């Protein structure tokens, strides 16, 4: 995905910085199109950059960009909300942190940062040819990590984390409030309550757990029948509560809805007190065993509709799960659309299969990656042990 070269572990630890002066930016003597217009409008026409969409160059500004000074139009706003917290398998964000698109991306070399920037945004906002200079660097630090807040026309907003939260809460259609992202120096290891299914392997492969981690960092409970509020409070506090129904074909003496009700009960015990600013996340996964009535109850209890995450190989639907969660990007439109008919047929096929039932945790594994914006992680390279 990214064009920045891999960091050399033997090299001296240093960060390269490019600062661009106004003379470099004023090279646009005549207006171009799209993003090429931005520098011309600001330098030649003295237009306030807040009146220009810094994602595409449109003058039809809907609101202000949350991370950098400048406007953002309605279509780019929707794209930004939909893609900001999406991650690739390499652990870095899938799209440019400015425009939330871009084909060739430059990766920040700060090991605590997962952000990327497209060539087009860097050249139009920082200065022509800057992307090539960045690409040639051994270890480049990005515009949200630099000590200096300005690079060319790109000016980092003050308190951009709170600006991002306000932007998301105001503009997103998601009924749940977004938690403000946490600065690196304040991030703590995530504490997890894993119900029914053990997700230790997934969290370890993502770098959230390491060998020798505090045993209390992950609490796995299979039978929660006798678990009461006092137990959860003594085990906690928790930052993430995860639960799932058994997979199709799994022998179980309890109805599928039991897992939903028990998850919801323990979720209430684990929640921080009302008004607490502490980031708190949860996820419940249905492995296609809940019937329509159960699904309606789940959506009412969890206060949202589920998102279907499919596993498609060679154009064929191999597996799928339904997910309810308040983790950012779970509700992204980038998830492939799967019809209820396809899910019903898949469930029937898996139910009649004689293969051993497996927990399809790999389908939701990458859904945890946005938590890197909130909690400490111990590895910058994802392992593919699943």
Swiss-Prot record:
GO CC field:
catalytic complex; condensed nuclear chromosome; cytoplasm; cytosol; ESC/E(Z) complex; heterochromatin; nucleus
- Write out the annotated subcellular location: Nucleus
Organism of origin is Homo sapiens
Q: What is this protein called?
A: DNA (cytosine-5)-methyltransferase 3-like
Xref: Pfam families = ADD_DNMT3, DNMT3_ADD_GATA1-like
Q: Quaternary structure per UniProt?
A: Homodimer. Heterotetramer composed of 1 DNMT3A homodimer and 2 DNMT3L subunits (DNMT3L-DNMT3A-DNMT3A-DNMT3L). Interacts with histone H3 (via N-terminus); interaction is strongly inhibited by methylation at lysine 4 (H3K4me). Interacts with EZH2; the interaction is direct. Interacts with SPOCD1.
Q: Which UniProt keywords apply?
A: Differentiation, Metal-binding, Nucleus, Spermatogenesis, Zinc, Zinc-finger
The residue ranges of the ADD domain are: 41-173
């Amino acid at each position: 995905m990214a064009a920045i070269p891999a960091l050399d572990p033997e090299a001296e630890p240093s960060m390269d910085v490019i600062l661009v002066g106004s003379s470099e930016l004023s090279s646009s003597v005549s207006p171009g199109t799209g993003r090429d217009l931005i520098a011309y409008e600001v330098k030649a026409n003295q237009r306030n950059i807040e009146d220009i969409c810094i994602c595409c160059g449109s003058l039809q500004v809907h609101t202000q960009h949350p991370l950098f000074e400048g406007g953002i139009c309605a279509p780019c706003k929707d794209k930004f909300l939909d893609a900001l917290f999406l991650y690739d398998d390499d652990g870095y964000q899938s799209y440019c942190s400015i425009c939330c698109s871009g084909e060739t991306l430059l990766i920040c070399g700060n090991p605590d940062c997962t952000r990327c920037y497209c060539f087009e945004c860097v050249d139009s906002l920082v200065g022509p040819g800057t992307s090539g200079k960045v690409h040639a660097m051994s270890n480049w630090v990005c515009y949200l990590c630099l000590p200096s807040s300005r690079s060319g026309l790109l000016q980092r907003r003050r308190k951009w984390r709170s600006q991002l939260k306000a932007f998301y809460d105001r503009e997103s259609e998601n009924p749940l409030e977004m938690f403000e992202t946490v600065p690196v120096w304040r991030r703590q290891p995530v504490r997890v309550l894993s119900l029914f299914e053990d997700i230790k392997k997934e969290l370890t492969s993502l770098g959230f757990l390491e060998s020798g981690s505090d045993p209390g960092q992950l609490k796995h409970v299979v039978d929660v029948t006798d678990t009461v509020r006092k137990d959860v409070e003594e085990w906690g506090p928790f930052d993430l509560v995860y639960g799932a129904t058994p997979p199709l074909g799994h022998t179980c003496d309890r109805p599928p809805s039991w897992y939903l009700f028990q998850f919801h009960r323990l979720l209430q015990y684990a929640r921080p007190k009302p008004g607490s600013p502490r980031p708190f996340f949860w996820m419940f996964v249905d492995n296609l065993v809940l019937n329509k009535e159960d699904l309606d109850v789940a959506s009412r209890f969890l206060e949202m509709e589920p998102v279907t995450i499919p596993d498609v190989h060679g154009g064929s639907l191999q597996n799928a799960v339904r997910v309810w969660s308040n983790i950012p990007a779970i509700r992204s439109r980038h998830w492939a659309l799967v019809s209820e008919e396809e899910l019903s047929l898949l469930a029937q096929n898996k139910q009649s299969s004689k293969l051993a039932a497996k927990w399809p945790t790999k389908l939701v594994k990458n859904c945890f990656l946005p938590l890197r914006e909130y909690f400490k992680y111990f590895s910058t390279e994802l392992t593919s042990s699943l």
